[in-house]
Amino acid sequence: MLLSVPLLLGLLGLAAADPAIYFKEQFLDGDAWTNRWVESKHKSDFGKFVLSSGKFYGDLEKDKGLQTSQDARFYALSAKFEPFSNKGQTLVVQFTVKHEQNIDCGGGYVKLFPSGLDQKDMHGDSEYNIMFGPDICGPGTKKVHVIFNYKGKNVLINKDIRCKDDEFTHLYTLIVRPDNTYEVKIDNSQVESGSLEDDWDFLPPKKIKDPDAAKPEDWDERAKIDDPTDSKPEDWDKPEHIPDPDAKKPEDWDEEMDGEWEPPVIQNPEYKGEWKPRQIDNPDYKGTWIHPEIDNPEYSPDANIYAYDSFAVLGLDLWQVKSGTIFDNFLITNDEAYAEEFGNETWGVTKAAEKQMKDKQDEEQRLKEEEEDKKRKEEEEAEDKEDDDDRDEDEDEEDEKEEDEEESPGQAKDEL
């Protein structure tokens, strides 16, 4: 069957528009994930990941992901995929993170490694291409890392991107485009964007201060100067403190014993402080001298800052003080629209139910604590009442004993 040219071009266009999905992981096949993910053996005490949907979730199966399970541990786990280069195309890295343990210090980011990585020896110093995701440590560090390896050096973003720090699942997305622009999204909403060259120090500055330029010696940057016609008044200088004129030597003051008496000093009401001449506009003022700039001879533009020869491994290489973080819904693609749709179909579908379950658990916990407090108070009141009753019984017995002792002498007299 022969196809018309317009139809053929249309089909080719549809084929070209299909997203390239380089890596996708949702952990929907039980323990089979252990066949795809490799634990590093670089250290013997790396923390263990387990498959879990956590203490609360929107869907028991869909929300299962890799959860850190041991406190105060480094973690090193990775999964490989068919190597690819992002040259000439958009790169989208996306995943969900849930810090249900109310994390105080720990990473929630991923690293993308080039081909050639020894997964069983992956560790903190293994060279990576991109590091992206949230990092929390105390109140001072709650940021989204976006780090690129450029010519062997890890370069951090110059902006501060705030991450989510609650207990719910959040969707993190990094988009790197072939025009050297980028975008960071959280929960499918843009939180930062811009130019790679502007927001990272990949390249030397375009302009530098002219090394041959210098501020002229007669350049006056003083906006105000002392009035040369102003002079200090003759009666200006007065001591700051003077002897108290109202003070009197005590009558019992013995100069042989106490020494010569000196009156206490007080603040001088006539003291005016340091004299300063009044200020006037400087007639020679030229403003702040600005060092002229020239083109930096060491600057050379790079149209391929965004590009890497190969991506082949996604790794979780991080430290956590308090475990419990769940990673899920990993996606690496070249299609921004597909990534947004995938996020809406995963995180977007279960987020409301997750919050409802957490709210229900919190309410149940609140009621349980109220009931426990009520029961504890009732027990304390019962114990107090029992103590009061015992005290009353003791007092009654003591009274009876005293009455018996009072009656005993009379009985003895009658017997006599």
Curated annotation (Swiss-Prot):
- Single GO cellular component term: postsynapse
Q: Where is this region: 4 X approximate repeats?
A: 191-255
Q: Where is this region: N-domain?
A: 18-197
Pinpoint the residue ranges of every sequence repeat in the record.
Answer: 191-202, 210-221, 227-238, 244-255, 259-269, 273-283, 287-297
Q: Does the keyword Transferase apply?
A: no
The residues that hold Ca(2+) are Q26, K62, K64, D328
Which portions of the sequence form the region Interaction with PPIB? Answer: 237-270
Please name every pair of cysteines joined by a disulfide bond in this record: C105-C137
Acidic residues bias: start-end ranges = 252-261, 380-408
Which keywords accompany this UniProt record? Acetylation, Calcium, Chaperone, Cytoplasm, Cytoplasmic vesicle, Disulfide bond, Endoplasmic reticulum, Extracellular matrix, Hydroxylation, Lectin, Lysosome, Metal-binding, Repeat, Sarcoplasmic reticulum, Secreted, Signal, Zinc
Q: A GO molecular-function term, please?
A: hormone binding
Q: List the residue ranges of the region (3 X approximate repeats).
A: 259-297
N6-acetyllysine modifications at: K48, K159, K209
Q: Which residues bind an alpha-D-glucoside?
A: Y109, K111, Y128, D135, D317
Renumbered to this chain, the Basic and acidic residues biased-composition regions fall at 207-251, 352-379
Segments of this protein annotated with the region C-domain: 309-416
PTM sites of type N6-(2-hydroxyisobutyryl)lysine: K64
Q: Which residues form the signal peptide?
A: 1-17
Q: Name the Gene Ontology biological process terms.
A: cardiac muscle cell differentiation; cellular response to electrical stimulus; cellular response to lithium ion; cellular response to virus; cellular senescence; cortical actin cytoskeleton organization; negative regulation of intracellular steroid hormone receptor signaling pathway; negative regulation of neuron differentiation
Share what the entry says about its subunit structure, partners included: Monomer. Interacts with GABARAP, NR3C1, PDIA3/ERp57 and TRIM21. Interacts (via P-domain) with PDIA5. Interacts with PPIB. Interacts with SPACA9. Component of an EIF2 complex at least composed of CELF1/CUGBP1, CALR, CALR3, EIF2S1, EIF2S2, HSP90B1 and HSPA5. Interacts with CLCC1.
Family of the protein in this entry = Belongs to the calreticulin family.
Could you identify this protein by its name? Calreticulin
